[in-house]
Amino acid sequence: MCAAQRSAAALAAAAPRTVYAFSARPLAGGEPFNLSSLRGKVLLIENVASLUGTTVRDYTQMNDLQRRLGPRGLVVLGFPCNQFGHQENAKNEEILNCLKYVRPGGGFEPNFMLFEKCEVNGEKAHPLFAFLREVLPTPSDDATALMTDPKFITWSPVCRNDVSWNFEKFLVGPDGVPVRRYSRRFLTIDIEPDIETLLSQGASA
């Protein structure tokens, strides 16, 4: 366990094991948004980038899930991050136009909440992602997923539970507890059965 992991573990042990302890500033600006306001919702959290090879696929699938399952209690949350191949190098105020006119383009507008750019690995990692990585150290579909190309590692320290690329996914249950982590190779749309299971649990609670 690296020093950052030990620190995160100590923090996690001292705090509730839910995402409700965290907040983030919306991409549109304004006051920090408290995730505690989403109690009872199923959350799908992804680190996103507007210039990635899977931007079109993942953004449109995130929109699709939010459109169809949002009325039943799903909330999709996107966190732009520039740590992987510098593929989110736009300023916060430029990201929506990049999505609208470049990728996915064609007037695309996300129907889910986007937050300001943040880091997900290293000393400056957003506390939410430090927490998610500690609770779910590896993707369930690929426990060996790692960033293996040194030229793309721009953060320090490097930890075994680091996010390895854009569009890793974290699924959180209606009680705020992280349930499952998926690699970048796992299609966003294929998380739907797991989301359905959690939505059913929430409805019967």
From Swiss-Prot:
The record marks K41, K91, K100, K124, K151, K169 as: Not glycated. This is Glutathione peroxidase 1. The modification N6-acetyllysine is found at K91, K117, K124, K151. PROSITE patterns: GLUTATHIONE_PEROXID_1, GLUTATHIONE_PEROXID_2, GLUTATHIONE_PEROXID_3. The keyword Manganese does not apply. Catalyzes the reduction of hydroperoxides in a glutathione-dependent manner thus regulating cellular redox homeostasis. Can reduce small soluble hydroperoxides such as H2O2, cumene hydroperoxide and tert-butyl hydroperoxide, as well as several fatty acid-derived hydroperoxides. In platelets catalyzes the reduction of 12-hydroperoxyeicosatetraenoic acid, the primary product of the arachidonate 12-lipoxygenase pathway. Its EC number is 1.11.1.9, 1.11.1.12. It comes from Bos taurus. Homotetramer. Interacts with MIEN1. During periods of oxidative stress, Sec-52 may react with a superoxide radical, irreversibly lose hydroselenide and be converted to dehydroalanine. PANTHER family: GLUTATHIONE PEROXIDASE (PTHR11592), GLUTATHIONE PEROXIDASE 1 (PTHR11592:SF41). The record marks U52 as: Subject to oxidation and hydroselenide loss to dehydroalanine. The modification Phosphoserine is found at S37, S200, S204. It catalyses: 2 glutathione + H2O2 = glutathione disulfide + 2 H2O; a hydroperoxy polyunsaturated fatty acid + 2 glutathione = a hydroxy polyunsaturated fatty acid + glutathione disulfide + H2O; tert-butyl hydroperoxide + 2 glutathione = tert-butanol + glutathione disulfide + H2O; cumene hydroperoxide + 2 glutathione = 2-phenylpropan-2-ol + glutathione disulfide + H2O. InterPro entries: Glutathione_peroxidase, GPX_AS, GPX_CS, Thioredoxin-like_sf. Keywords: Acetylation, Cytoplasm, Glycation, Glycoprotein, Lipid metabolism, Mitochondrion, Oxidoreductase, Peroxidase, Phosphoprotein, Selenocysteine. One of its GO terms (biological process) is positive regulation of supramolecular fiber organization. The modification N6-succinyllysine is found at K91, K117, K151. It comes from the Eukaryota.
